[in-house]
């Protein structure tokens, strides 16, 4: 029966290695589909294996579109050879379905005329009376030629397996007629037949999609098996290779109705085959006798490997391995090409074609154990003992000599076994370390990818916000420019009208002035003519109009002036704030210190009795009442001080304290061993490294002599960083992101603790608490 497009689709997906299959799934998720089809859920694609993936594709898209979509994805991930093979197979299958009736009839007539040696019995022995058995349950074995005895399985390309399947089976699933002599000395059948025409035992069961056809010979031990034909399900469809696994009878599988011979009959056949050689047809028509095989022949292993098979010393690929003949050398995974007859290869032994490691054929005599090393001092004495004092192997005579008298001498096998156990233990340890390293590398890669994604997201966010700001400023610019242009146009129109009116008044005045000047130069008789009218007009001439700004213009100009001042102030504030915030990243020491932040709490057992604490021991302030507390050696009795917890003797520690608007405080670190009774001097010699705010905006460090500190911006939050290894204590103004002071070259001879003092009340001005603030960062070194 011909393969369906679904079978070709599954075969193509199984050809993908895991890495390419993951690329296929990822590309499939991002490939657009036709509108009439719904997309496969992403979760199902991510969990799917080849069989499940093929089922999902056919279920959601149908066979034809599933094949088209698979071809599109394969080409997208540069799997063009697989895409071309699937394309040819799909075209061939569609053309085969159109001519299925004629091909079926032709193949049926062809199957009736097959040679007897190539026909498959309908009712094999051991299964008679059960009706016709469907294909795929274990076909009858065909006889193999003698040159195939030394041949192992080799993987073939997909196109070649299709050709073999199409040539070896007709439309009804029966083997087609083929020539007994095939190229390369291959047998026409999938396996060797037992004597008397009985079929070998073969069980098949379903396996995972990662499986492959692995045939183990069901005959006597040491017998090889040829590649089986394709197997078909009862429905008529070919069973995918990933669902077939051949199980040898040595696995004690449960009884299966598809078994051709029972285990008892197989054992009897093996015993019969072990007593006499069997004649086996060869490609040239002759016969050759097989070696005796069975339990009585010690030269044959239980796994069915001939005695002349040797492993490659470098890649450990077993020549003629019945599983898959794959070279498993660390740097080589090339499937080995199986040879024909052992004697047909000449003097050069076959080997792995990639790592070029030849598989030397060794005779049974060459497999004898090598002689044990002999003692150099005492000839012919085998070194069977080991001297642990000299760390060398010795013989029995050496152990009795004066040189080794009283030494620890043990059997060399016992010492070797002990060292093997140590080696195994170290190997396990190193493998665990390597696994841990791989996990850490994977974790590091994940974190790096996560950080890169976060960086890219922040970059896009900043760009988007700045674009919004730029767009807003651009809009405001257009608004102001347009408003000012409107006001300018209005002022221009008003000025033009005013100029017109004033020009008319000036022209009238110029006319009257001219007339009066002319009258002044005339004679008396002419002067007195019309003088009254001219003088009247001169007295009643209108005064030129004064300039008056319209109220609308005044209001608009005032409004624009106010807005411009607001924009100027806002822009200045925004620029200063942004510059200040950006300068916070210019203190790399503070950023590095914050990476070593620790969780610090207040130790109430060390506190001055008047101090009041919060429930979480993160905040402290000075109270009004003297609390009656146990006066232990660790409590301060005269200084308003409380220590922090935990103490530390190594590494680097960082914590931050909110001081707010307090007018006095003390912060820093001190030795755990300091005296806590009576008055004390805060200095490094006495074990105190602190910064003190004595009065408002007056700061000093407790050095000798005290160092006055000039701080431009009073800190609202103070950061303290202690590097025990270097011997330094640094103070930072977290608010201004600036450095305050550093005690360098300190001598720490014991554990240190954080120290806090909220200061005196200062007439009610200093009642606010000191609060330990959380800091994001890594833990201590």
UniProtKB/Swiss-Prot annotation:
Carries keyword Signal?
A: no
Return the InterPro entries for the record.
B30.2/SPRY (IPR001870), B30.2/SPRY_sf (IPR043136), Butyrophylin_SPRY (IPR003879), ConA-like_dom_sf (IPR013320), DAPIN (IPR004020), DEATH-like_dom_sf (IPR011029), PRY (IPR006574), SPRY_dom (IPR003877)
ZnF locations on chain (B box-type): 370-412
Q: What is the effect of changing residue 702 to C?
A: In one patient with familial Mediterranean fever
Q: How the protein is affected by changing residue 695 to R? A: In ARFMF; reduced penetrance among Ashkenazi Jews
Q: Which stretches of sequence are listed as region Interaction with RELA?
A: 266-280
- State the Gene3D superfamilies in the record: 2.60.120.920, Classic Zinc Finger, Death Domain, Fas
Keyword set includes Secreted: no
Instruction: List residues, modification Phosphoserine.
Output: 242
Reported impact of residue 577 to A: Found in an autosomal dominant autoinflammatory disease with some similarities to familial Mediterranean fever; likely pathogenic
PROSITE patterns tied to this protein:
B302_SPRY, DAPIN, ZF_BBOX
The outcome of changing residue 247 to V is:
In ARFMF; uncertain significance
Result of changing residue 283 to L: In ARFMF; uncertain significance
Keyword field: Actin-binding, Amyloidosis, Cell projection, Coiled coil, Cytoplasm, Cytoplasmic vesicle, Cytoskeleton, Disease variant, Immunity, Inflammatory response, Innate immunity, Metal-binding, Microtubule, Nucleus, Phosphoprotein, Zinc, Zinc-finger
Result after altering residue 632 to A: In ARFMF; uncertain significance
Q: Where is this region: Disordered?
A: 93-226, 270-322, 336-373
The source's superkingdom equals Eukaryota
Q: Which residues are annotated as site, described as Cleavage? A: 330-331
The name under which this protein is listed is: Pyrin
Give the organism, scientific name: Homo sapiens
């Amino acid at each position: 029966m011909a393969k369906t497009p679904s079978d070709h689709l599954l075969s193509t997906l199984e050809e993908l290695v895991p890495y390419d299959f993951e690329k296929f799934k990822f590309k499939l998720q991002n490939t657009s589909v036709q509108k009439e089809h719904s997309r496969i859920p992403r979760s199902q694609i991510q969990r799917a294996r080849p069989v499940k993936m093929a089922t999902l594709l056919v279920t959601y898209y149908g066979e034809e579109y599933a094949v088209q979509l698979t071809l599109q994805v394969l080409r997208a991930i540069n799997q063009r050879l697989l895409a071309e093979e699937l394309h040819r197979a799909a075209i061939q299958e569609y053309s085969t379905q159109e001519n299925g009736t004629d091909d079926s009839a032709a193949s049926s007539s062809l199957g009736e005329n097959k040679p007897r040696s190539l026909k498959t019995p309908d009712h094999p022995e051991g299964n008679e009376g059960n009706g016709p058995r469907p294909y795929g349950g274990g076909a009858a074995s065909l006889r193999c030629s003698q040159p195939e005895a030394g041949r192992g399985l080799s993987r073939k390309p997909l196109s070649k397996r299709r050709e073999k399947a199409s040539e070896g089976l007709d439309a009804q699933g029966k083997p087609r007629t083929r020539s007994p002599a095939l190229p390369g000395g291959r047998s026409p059948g999938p396996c060797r037949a037992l004597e008397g025409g009985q079929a070998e035992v073969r069980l098949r069961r379903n396996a995972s999609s990662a499986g492959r056809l692995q045939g183990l010979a069901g005959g006597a031990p040491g017998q090889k098996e040829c590649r089986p034909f394709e197997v078909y399900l009862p429905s008529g469809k070919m069973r995918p290779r990933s669902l077939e696994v051949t199980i040898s009878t040595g696995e004690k599988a449960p009884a299966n109705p598809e078994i051709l011979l029972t285990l008892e009959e197989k054992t009897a056949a093996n015993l019969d085959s072990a007593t006499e050689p069997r004649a086996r047809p060869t490609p040239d028509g002759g016969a050759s006798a097989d070696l005796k095989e069975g339990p009585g022949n010690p030269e044959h292993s239980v796994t069915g490997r001939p005695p002349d098979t040797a492993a490659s010393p470098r890649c450990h690929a077993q020549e003629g391995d019945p599983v898959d003949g794959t070279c498993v050398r660390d740097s080589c995974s090339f499937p080995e090409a199986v040879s024909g007859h052992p004697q047909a290869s000449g003097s050069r032994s076959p080997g792995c074609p990639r790592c070029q490691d030849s598989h030397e054929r060794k005779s049974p005599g060459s497999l004898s154990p090598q002689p044990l090393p002999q003692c150099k001092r005492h000839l012919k004495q085998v070194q069977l003992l080991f001297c642990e004092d000299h760390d060398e192997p010795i013989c029995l005579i050496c152990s009795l000599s004066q040189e080794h008298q009283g030494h620890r001498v043990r059997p060399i096998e016992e010492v070797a076994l002990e060292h093997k156990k140590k080696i195994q233990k170290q190997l396990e340890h190193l493998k665990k370390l390597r696994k841990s390293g791989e996990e850490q590398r994977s974790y590091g890669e994940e974190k790096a990818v996560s950080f890169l994604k976060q960086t890219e997201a922040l970059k896009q966010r900043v760009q988007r916000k700045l674009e919004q700001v730029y767009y807003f400023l651009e809009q405001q610019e257009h608004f102001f420019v347009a408003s000012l242009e409107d006001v300018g146009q209005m002022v221009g129109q008003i000025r033009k009208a005013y100029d017109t009116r004033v020009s008319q008044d000036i022209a009238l005045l110029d006319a009257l002035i001219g007339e009066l000047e002319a009258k002044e130069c005339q004679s008396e008789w002419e002067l007195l003519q019309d003088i009254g009218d001219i003088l009247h007009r001169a007295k009643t001439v209108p005064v030129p109009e004064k300039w008056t700004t319209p109220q609308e213009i005044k209001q608009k100009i005032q409004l624009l002036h106010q807005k411009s001042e607001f924009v100027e102030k806002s822009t200045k504030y925004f620029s200063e704030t942004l510059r200040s915030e950006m300068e916070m990243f210019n203190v790399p020491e503070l950023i590095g210190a914050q990476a070593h932040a620790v969780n610090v709490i207040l130790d109430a057992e060390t506190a001055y009795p008047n101090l009041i604490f919060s429930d979480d021991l993160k905040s402290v302030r000075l109270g009004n009442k003297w609390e009656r507390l146990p006066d232990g050696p660790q409590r301060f009795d005269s200084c308003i001080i409380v220590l922090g917890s935990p103490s530390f003797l190594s590494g680097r520690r960082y914590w931050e304290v909110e001081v707010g608007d307090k007018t006095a405080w003390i912060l820093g670190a001190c030795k755990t061993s300091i005296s806590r009774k009576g008055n004390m001097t805060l200095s490094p010699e006495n074990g105190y490294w602190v910064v003190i705010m004595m009065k408002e905006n007056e700061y000093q460090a407790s050095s000798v002599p005290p160092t006055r500190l000039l701080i431009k911006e009073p800190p609202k939050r103070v950061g303290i960083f202690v590097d025990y290894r270097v011997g330094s204590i640094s103070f930072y103004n977290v608010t201004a992101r600036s450095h305050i002071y550093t005690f360098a070259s300190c001598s720490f001879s014991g554990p240190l603790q954080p120290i806090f003092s909220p200061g005196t009340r200062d007439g009610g001005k200093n009642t606010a608490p000191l609060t330990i603030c959380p800091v994001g960062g890594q833990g201590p070194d």
